[in-house]
Amino acid sequence: MEDATFNNQDKLPISSDDLVKLLNDCEIEFDLYSHKPLYTVKESKIFYESQYENNELNCHIKNLYLRDKKKNNYLFVFDQDKIIDLKQLNHLISATRLSFGSPQRLFENLGVFPGAVSPFCMLNGKKNGVKLFFDTSFKKTK
């Protein structure tokens, strides 16, 4: 299935093909799911309910690319149903004025376009100083 990221493989810091090769080279088992860009949790739920019987994936996430007043970049990974309060998140990480990063910064720092953000983006994000935060509720997930 083609999407914006697929059509721009040559512009990505690490292409999806290179990511698959890296996982295979590291002997990391994985299942590959291809889908159109999903911009909202609602879109994600509709897509997965229509594609996969019994909702076979046991952990559904939402990824938020945020930036603060000091121009620090963050990738937050939450359970898809968790309600996020950006003001509270500011206090939790001692940031000021968290807001969503622009599509241009998203591509520059994580190497993807909106609708294609995942924790794997940190392969690009780490070298660009993006800080990664996982919600602790994932400890309960397989």
Over which residues does each language-model region extend?
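Extended, low-hydrophobicity, polar/charged segments
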Residues: 1-142
